[in-house]
Every structure is written in structure tokens, then in C-alpha cells.
């Protein structure tokens, strides 16, 4: 039987570098940033959860369930993952950020194959050089481990997965796949690239 995969799109941060504008909702080439991410991910998973801590009504307009961090206080991406892991019955949860509009269209099959080949618990994407700590495929049963880690005051996703059996899947064949839009300047630059 094939594995069921759900996804959470993380849009729960404060987006300080974007000047406080909600990063998932800023417009990139006529569409909300998160819509680009949704379009990349939707064909690859069963259900999508959108993790947001403000503008929840606006996020709901994309047609997916919106979930807010169960640990309040903007504790970082782990808080969004923990919440999503508690709300899925899938075999694996794909975690992606809302601000990577060019994610690979073959992200899930490659991450899943990497996990299965090594009987690992987690796959982490890499651009060939750097690991992408918020682009993960993981087993929802890891929730208790992640929750304990967060509640011990830890915040770094890569420190958490280092405690588990993880594999790195490289997407060096797709140099722009993890282009990350954190500032208005980066958004401008990407908009010009896309329309070229
Ligand atoms: N649920 C949740 N997600 C978060 C939180 N902080 C960051 N994220 C998400 O984690 C991903 C990576 O974080 P950043 O790129 O630093 O985003 P950010 O923290 O909103 O932006 P900055 O304030 O500029 O650092 C983004 O998809 C964020 O939405 C948080 O407190 N809760
Ligand atoms: Mg941040």
C-alpha cells in the first residue's frame, strides 16, 4: 500500500524582515506568496494544512484547514510542526515554508524514496550545499520528541532532527528550488527573474 502524505505550509512567523507584512500573503507576480507554494505542493500530497498565527480568515480563502500554534508566543517553526503533527493521520508529514515559491515538483517522491532506502525517520532537503531545516518529510509519531525539545527551551530545527535517524536528499539538479523570500528586495528580485 502506498504511503499517505499530508503537508503543512508554515506561515506562522512574524516576518520581521518583510517589514511585518504577513509573508505568506504578500503579493508575488499577482498572487499571494503562499499560493505559489500551494501550487507546487498540492499535486504531491493528500491534504494541506496552513499554519498561521494571524490573518487566519484570509488564509482560509485558499480552501485548506488553517491551524494556529498550540504553543503561543511565536516560538519558531517547531511550534507549527508540532501543531500539524497532532492534526494529521498521514504516514508522513511534509513540512515546507510559505516563502519558497519555487519548491521542487518532485519533492515528495524523492524525500520519501530517501527515507525508505535508509529506513530513516526524517528526510531533510538540501540545495546541494546547505540543508533546508524547514523542508522536511517526517513521521508524525515524532511529535512527542519535538514537543519535549521545544518545551526544554530549544528552538533550532536542525539540532532536533540531529537526534534522530535522518537522511539528506540533495536537489542540486534544481539550483533555484529553495529560493527563499525574506525581504521586499528579495521579492522584487524574484518577481523580475520569474517574468524574464
Ligand atoms: N508556526 C510558526 N512558524 C514560524 C514561527 N517563526 C517562523 N516560522 C515559520 O518558519 C519559516 C522560517 O522562518 P523565517 O523565514 O525566519 O520567517 P519569519 O520568522 O516569519 O521571518 P523573520 O521575522 O524575518 O525571521 C517560515 O515559514 C515562518 O513562517 C513561529 O513562531 N511559529
Ligand atoms: Mg525568523
UniProtKB/Swiss-Prot annotation:
Mg(2+) binds at residue 99. It comes from the Bacteria. One of its GO terms (biological process) is bis(molybdopterin guanine dinucleotide)molybdenum biosynthetic process. Pfam families: NTP_transf_3. The keyword Cytoplasm applies. SUPFAM superfamilies: Nucleotide-diphospho-sugar transferases (SSF53448). Its cofactor is Mg(2+). Its EC number is 2.7.7.77. CDD domains: MobA (cd02503). It is found in: Cytoplasm. GTP binds at residues 10-12, 23, 51, 69, 99. GO terms for molecular function: GTP binding; metal ion binding; molybdenum cofactor guanylyltransferase activity. Disulfide bonds: none annotated. It is an enzyme of class 2 (transferase). Transfers a GMP moiety from GTP to Mo-molybdopterin (Mo-MPT) cofactor (Moco or molybdenum cofactor) to form Mo-molybdopterin guanine dinucleotide (Mo-MGD) cofactor. The N-terminal domain determines nucleotide recognition and specific binding, while the C-terminal domain determines the specific binding to the target protein. NCBIfam families: molyb_mobA. This is Molybdenum cofactor guanylyltransferase.
